């Protein structure tokens, strides 16, 4: 079943916050990314998490990016990581990939994330998508993949044109291949899950999104929404 998803749909799903609410009610999230020279992507993602309403935001990134993150968003708890790192306890949703290059540092970080077990859901975006093909991704965690058409083509081993010619089938194929929910970005973004027959098409957006960093923001908005409560205690 195909359904339309738009701003009105999203607005209806977000609760008005209780006057008794506190930061612990709105999730603990972490962004992992930002190789040397690409820290802006990870910083944008962590900032978008704040603006989307996450209760607590962590950022694990290359040490060279920590100062810039703290200057721009002191609310974000930024950590510099070298070859390995430890996740804080009880992360609800983890976003891995913004600003990750296809290099050894990034690959080590990716492997640390996939082998960790102290978070709920993992969103794999941008650079992290390079590694799931060569690593035959195996994790029991709930996964969301957020490829643009070029990344989708690499995940499926087909051409960009083939993805664009049948975006619905491409999204479903990725979802089934990796047992993951998928957000296939682009004109009429496709949202689907491997364990649900429903499929959503989002008609919002336009050419104003054709700019570096918008995908990093989208991934953060998406994963932050997963941490927000669907109800409050009476």
Task: Put a short name on every predicted segment.
Residues 1-121, 130-144, 153-226, 231:
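Small-residue (G/A/S/T)-rich helix-start motifs and N-terminal tracts that mark the onset
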């Amino acid at each position: 079943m195909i359904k339309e998803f738009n701003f009105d749909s999203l607005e209806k799903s977000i609760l008005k916050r209780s006057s008794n609410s506190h930061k612990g009610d709105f999730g603990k999230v972490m962004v992992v990314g930002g190789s040397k020279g690409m820290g802006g992507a990870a910083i944008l993602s962590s900032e978008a998490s704040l603006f989307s309403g996450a209760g607590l935001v962590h950022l694990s990134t290359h040490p060279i990016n920590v100062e810039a993150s703290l200057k721009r968003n002191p609310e974000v708890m930024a950590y510099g990581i070298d070859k390995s790192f430890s996740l804080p306890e009880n992360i609800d949703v983890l976003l891995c990939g913004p600003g990750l290059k296809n290099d050894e540092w990034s690959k080590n970080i990716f492997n640390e994330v996939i082998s960790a077990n102290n978070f709920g859901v993992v969103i794999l975006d941008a650079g992290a998508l390079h590694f799931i093909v060569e690593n035959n991704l195996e994790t029991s965690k709930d996964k969301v993949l957020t490829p643009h058409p070029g990344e989708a083509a690499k995940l499926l081993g087909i051409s960009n044109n083939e993805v664009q010619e049948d975006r619905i089938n491409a999204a479903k194929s990725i979802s089934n291949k990796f047992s993951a929910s998928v957000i296939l970005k682009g004109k009429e973004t496709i949202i689907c899950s491997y364990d649900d027959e429903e499929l959503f098409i989002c008609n919002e957006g336009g050419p104003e999104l054709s700019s570096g960093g918008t995908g990093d923001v989208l991934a953060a908005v998406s994963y932050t929404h997963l941490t927000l409560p669907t109800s409050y205690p009476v």
